[in-house]
């Protein structure tokens, strides 16, 4: 097998090795009692936020093929869209500092394009592989492929998913792990636990219920790692297989287990807990945090938490324990909140005892952990802002009802906005095409561009709110109650303040090592004040990860350091590939028989 030196000489790994700022001996080895160590003098205190600070790495390659197959994760058959014929998609894993080269093949026969987003991966100075049709690329046409290549300068647990409209809600996602140090010790790694809500109908069909102004469709079951249960009778419904199973894992007394809870849902923010066990939170969204203990956790769509669970349960009532997850706002919206089983006795196949649902779990609410709980291990101080942040600059979340739209001439469609306009991107002319053109091109208002033409290292602040006076907004909207998991591409952000109720000017920002992450839950009728450093040129999406809301336009795009974008793409030698892919998509799209008045039936993202 080639050595690391061979990889570097061959030019396959873009190597930049900087001082690790390690606090531990250089010979410290990662193990059950030394998880803060990593390798080559790198450890939990090494400043991963600097993309130049990463260990030496190797090349790791994967192939992902997109197809439609019949799946029945909860015992009910339906057509799913999946990677490599499996649901969820295969685990993609690498080590901190590695370069991943992932080739995506679109073998769909239903006419859909596709593109893959590497959720939470910073993609420093490689915006063109962020995988957002209409923003960073044209879709991959059926029968064609695309190579995504990036270096893992962060570590932790995340996921990858289609960013082509609602495609991932039909099953097109999988877990992603970048191995690195941990802020607390553990013995056994149980890997990612993907938690999702599940439907028996196609997501593109269901979306029209929401577009018509009705409440978003309610899922029928909850899945943990692609397994769940749905109450049906095979004798009455041929789609019912009668084969239902919970996700199960085995614990050994006294062992400490690490796992990562990853919310890959379409609609629901989940409250998660394990009967009879506390757990220690050690990471949130690729940001290692000082360990803290709890027994219940809210996980918004797109959020990830690495936790450590010690196998020390009181087994007087039995040796098996339920894993639970329910919707944070209405616990009974899916009647069964049991999503998995932990067994101390592998031979025991009985159902665990079911303790009464505590008020703590039922009324836990929809808030993220408190700012005082999520303390980053690698400390950062937020600098002064360079942008305006008055009330007229707030990012006001709301639903716009019964208005004409670029993609639907019948003015009965309900949309969501994160600014003044619901987003609508054109798959044939993505933002990066405009930014790399030989002449200046205007961004249509429905692409919702927000230009960040500031120097590297300067900070921008933004206030997200779903609780404000309607007199303060340009376009009418309804303050429909909902949790909004807001995700930023290309960065994580600092959370300066967060809460319920309206934001008031007397609220002071937390600037000294505030929590950092890439998805923040704006609670029902609440706000979140975020900030990030301008240092990664590109067109980066900010959007609600509630899929129906994103589909209905709840997004904007930051055009960051626009003058640096084209030189980066040219220097990387990918400008021709980018143009060829768009030309290929246009040829395919123009050859498809699509009615003139229905070219694209949602925001595109």
Swiss-Prot record:
Alphabetic keyword roster: Copper, Glycoprotein, Metal-binding, Oxidoreductase, Signal
The keyword Signal appears for this protein: yes
Binding site for Cu cation 1: 117, 487
Catalytic reaction list: 2 dihydrogeodin + O2 + 2 H(+) = 2 (+)-geodin + 2 H2O
Principal EC category: oxidoreductase
Positions annotated as glycosylated: 27, 107, 112, 278, 467
Textual note on the cofactor: Binds 4 Cu cations per monomer.
Cofactor(s) required for function per UniProt: Cu cation
Keyword Repressor included in the entry's annotation: no
Alphabetized Pfam families for the sequence: Cu-oxidase, Cu-oxidase_2, Cu-oxidase_3
Enzyme Commission (EC) number: 1.10.3.-
Binding site for Cu cation 4: 484, 544, 549
Sequence positions that bind Cu cation 2: 119, 161, 545
UniProt-annotated binding residues for Cu cation 3: 163, 489, 543
Residue ranges annotated for the Plastocyanin-like domain, each copy included: 65-183, 189-347, 424-567
InterPro entries reported in the protein's UniProt record: Cu-oxidase-like_N (IPR011707), Cu-oxidase_2nd (IPR001117), Cu-oxidase_C (IPR011706), Cu-oxidase_fam (IPR045087), Cu_oxidase_CS (IPR033138), Cu_oxidase_Cu_BS (IPR002355), Cupredoxin (IPR008972)
Primary role: Dihydrogeodin oxidase; part of the gene cluster that mediates the biosynthesis of geodin, an intermediate in the biosynthesis of other natural products. The pathway begins with the synthesis of atrochrysone thioester by the polyketide synthase (PKS) gedC. The atrochrysone carboxyl ACP thioesterase gedB then breaks the thioester bond and releases the atrochrysone carboxylic acid from gedC. The atrochrysone carboxylic acid is then converted to atrochrysone which is further transformed into emodinanthrone.
Family as reported in the entry's similarity comment: Belongs to the multicopper oxidase family.
Name by which UniProt lists this protein: Dihydrogeodin oxidase
């Amino acid at each position: 097998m080639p050595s690391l030196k061979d990889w570097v000489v061959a030019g396959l790994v873009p190597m930049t090795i900087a001082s690790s700022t390690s606090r531990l001996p250089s010979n410290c080895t990662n193990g059950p009692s030394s998880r803060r160590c990593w390798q080559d003098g790198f450890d939990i205190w090494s400043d991963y936020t600097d993309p130049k600070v990463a260990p030496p790495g190797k090349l790791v390659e994967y192939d992902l093929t997109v197809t439609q197959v019949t799946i029945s994760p909860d015992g009910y058959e339906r057509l799913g869209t999946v990677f490599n014929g499996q649901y969820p998609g295969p685990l993609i894993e690498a080590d901190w500092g590695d370069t991943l080269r992932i080739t995506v093949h679109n073998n769909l026969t239903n006419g859909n394009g596709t593109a893959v987003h590497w959720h939470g991966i910073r993609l420093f100075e490689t915006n063109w592989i962020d995988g957002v049709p209409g923003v960073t690329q044209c879709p991959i046409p059926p029968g064609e492929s695309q190579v995504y290549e990036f270096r893992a300068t962060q570590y932790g647990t995340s996921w990858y998913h289609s960013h082509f409209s609602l495609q991932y809600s039909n099953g097109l996602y999988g877990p992603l792990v970048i191995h690195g140090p941990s802020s607390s010790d553990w013995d056994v790694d149980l890997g990612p636990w993907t938690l999702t809500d599940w439907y028996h109908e196609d997501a593109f069909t269901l979306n029209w219920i929401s577009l018509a102004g009705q409440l978003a469709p309610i899922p029928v079951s909850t899945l943990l790692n692609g397994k769940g249960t749905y109450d049906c009778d095979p004798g009455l419904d041929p789609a019912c297989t009668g084969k239902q199973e919970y996700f199960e894992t085995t614990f050994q007394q006294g062992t400490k287990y690490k796992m990562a809870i990853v919310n890959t849902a379409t609609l629901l923010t989940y409250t998660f807990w394990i009967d009879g066990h506390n757990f220690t939170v050690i990471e949130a969204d690729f940001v290692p945090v000082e360990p803290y203990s709890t027994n219940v956790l809210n996980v918004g769509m797109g959020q990830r938490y690495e936790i450590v669970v010690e196998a020390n349960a009181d087994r007087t009532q039995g040796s098996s324990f339920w894993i639970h997850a329910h919707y944070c706002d209405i616990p009974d919206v899916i009647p069964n909140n049991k999503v998995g089983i932990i067994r101390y006795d592998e031979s025991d196949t009985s159902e665990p005892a079911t303790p009464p649902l505590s008020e703590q779990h039922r009324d836990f609410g929809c808030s993220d952990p408190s700012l005082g709980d999520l303390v980053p291990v690698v400390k950062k101080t937020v600098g002064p802002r360079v942008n305006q942040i008055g009330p007229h600059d707030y990012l006001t979340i709301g639903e716009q009802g019964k208005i004409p739209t670029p993609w639907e001439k019948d003015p009965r469609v309900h949309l969501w906005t994160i600014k003044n306009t619901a987003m609508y991107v054109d798959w044939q002319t993505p933002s990066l095409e405009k930014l790399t053109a030989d002449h200046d091109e205007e961004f249509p208002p429905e692409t919702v561009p927000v230009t960040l033409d500031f120097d590297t290292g300067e900070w921008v602040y933004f206030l997200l709110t779903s609780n404000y006076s309607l007199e303060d907004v340009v376009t009418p909207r309804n303050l429909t109650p909902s949790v909004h998991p807001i995700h930023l591409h290309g960065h994580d952000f600092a959370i300066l303040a967060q809460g319920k109720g309206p934001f008031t000017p007397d609220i002071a920002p937390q600037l000294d090592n505030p929590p950092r992450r890439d998805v923040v839950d704006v609670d029902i009728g609440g706000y979140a004040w975020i900030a990030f450093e301008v240092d990664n040129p590109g067109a980066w999406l900010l959007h609600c990860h509630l899929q129906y809301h994103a589909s209905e336009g709840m997004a904007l795009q930051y055009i960051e350091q626009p003058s640096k974008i084209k030189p980066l793409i040219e220097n990387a030698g990918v400008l021709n590939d980018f143009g060829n892919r768009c030309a290929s998509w246009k040829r395919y799209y123009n050859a498809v028989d699509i009615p003139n008045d229905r070219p694209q039936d949602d925001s595109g993202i």
